[in-house]
C-alpha cells in the first residue's frame, strides 16, 4: 500500500527539533508506527513492546534495555513497559540531543499520568487519528482552518466539489489505513479482527473489565447513541450492567481512543447550561460496522444518517485542530430549554459557532440562535452551517454555508 501523507507530520517534525522525547498517542492501527518509520532515518533503532522478549528486558532491566536498543530509538506501544520512563528521564538529562527518543502508545488511561510525572518538560505529546477525508484525498493544507468567506473560498479552489456519495463512502469506510479500497467482505473481517485481536486484549489489560461479552454489547450500545448526549442509564441497559459500571467502561473506551467525548460549553454568565458531554466515535467506519450498516447507501438513506454525518464533521474538526498550529477548545452549547449549537470553536477568546446539517440547503435561520453568545461578554467570530452545499455561500456578514469537505 502506498504511503499516505499525514497532516501531523509537520507538527511532529517541529516538536522533534524542540523536545528530546516525542510521544504519539492514538488508537491501534491508525498509522502511528507507519508515520514514524516513514519519517525516521536509517540510523534510528526500532523495537516494539508487543515483542515479549523485548518487553521482559524493559521490565527487568531498563538500563540494559537501552544498552541493547540504543538511541536514537523508536519504541512502539510503550505503555506496556512503564518501567522505561525513569530511564528515559536519565537519558534525557545526560544528553542535549533533540528528538532522541520517539514513543507510540495506544492506551492513554494507563500511560499519561506516569508520562507527565516522569518526563515533564522533556516530552512533546501528539495524537494521531485515523485518516481524515483530506488525507485520503491527498490534500494536506499548511494553513489552519479559517471560517471567513474569503479563506473558505480560497480553500474551495483547491478541492473538488462536495459530494454526498463520497462523504458517506468515507463515513462508512472509515479512516483505518488497512481498509482503504478493500471490498465489503474484507472490511467486515478487518473490523471483526480489530475488535477481537486488539480492542478486547487492550480492554483485558486495563484490568477493570473481565466480562468481554457484556463489553461487546456495551460497545454496540455506544454506537447506537452516536452524536447524542451520554446517557449512562441507556448504555448500562444495553449491556445489562450498572450505570456506574457504564461510566467506568466509557472511560476505558475514551482512553483507548475509540470514543471521543465533546464537552459542553460552560460560562458563568450563561445560566442553566448542560453539563453532559456528547458521544462520538473516533472512527466512523468502526461505528458503522458495530451498527451493521452493510453499505454506504443504506447508511446514507437510513434513519441515523444525520447522526453519522454529524459524527463525521465533528471528528474532521477534531483532527484538523489536533494537527493545527494554533490551540483551540472544541465544545458544544446546550441550555435547559434544549437550545443547542453543535460546535463552539474557541480560539484566542473568540467563539466561532457552527451548526451541522446533512442537507445541501439548510434553513439559514439556524444562525439566529448564535445570538446567545452575545448575551455574555464573549467575542463572536465567523461561523456558519456546515452542510452538503457545493461552495461557500454567505448567510450574513458573520456566517456562511460551509461545504463539509472544507473542514
Predicted regions and their residues:
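A cross-kingdom feature that marks ATP-driven nucleic-acid transaction machinery
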Residues: 1-29, 33-49, 251-252, 257-259, ...
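Conserved catalytic/switch belt of AAA+ P-loop NTPases
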Residues: 85-109, 116-117
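Conserved P-loop NTPase "ATPase switch" module shared by AAA+ and STAND
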Residues: 68-84
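Short glycine-rich substrate-engagement loop in P-loop NTPases that contacts/grips substrate
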Residues: 44-72
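Interdomain hinge/linker elements that couple catalytic modules in large macromolecular machines
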Residues: 138-316, 328-331
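Short regulatory helix/loop adjacent to the ATP-binding pocket of P-loop NTPases
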Residues: 109-125, 137-142
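A short beta-strand-to-loop transition that corresponds to the Sensor-1 phosphate-sensing loop
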Residues: 104-108, 114, 129-131, 387-390
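Residue-level preference for the first positions of well-ordered beta-strands
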Residues: 21-23, 71-74, 100
